[in-house]
Amino acid sequence: CGQPFASKGLPEQADAKQREVEQALLKASRNGADPIVIDTSPCSLRLKRNQQALGLKVYDITEFLHDAVLPRLTLRKLPETIALHPTCSTTNMGLQTKLKAIAEACAERVIIPDRVSCCGWAGDKGFTLPELNASALRDLKAALPEACQSGYSTSRTCEIGLSLHSGRYYRSIVYLVDRCSQPNTS
């Protein structure tokens, strides 16, 4: 989607890659006839900017799960405490409430640490400047109770850093929905 280039301060390359992806999505979606679901929020945010002009219907995984998938499932709330990390992109799209609602539908207790707002990965800079990630997540481990053994988010790079600095395994919110759901048979 161009995000790695954008995070490196290379806007022309980012825009070129985004246009390339948009053209591929137009083809894959039969010129916008089919919806596109993006499972990483930073790319969703970038691709949503031009969706109307291109005739695409782009959905972030959070809004797709909340609006289209959950109503079709029977959920069994897990007797667990989980951590949830709304990414910067999730917040910028105004989807943090839907993300929290998904998590609360699936787990008995959801922890969103107050002092952790950004994972500090900054696109892909966490690979080359790990101190950004370490600084942003310095309060994470202490903010999670011992009973909290897993975490969920909507960006794989954020999840890498969150896992590293929390001592818990973070992964996509899709996995949580999968763990607690069954198809609605009615």
Where are these regions (language model features)?
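Iron-sulfur cluster-binding electron-transfer modules in prokaryotic oxidoreductases
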Residues: 1-186
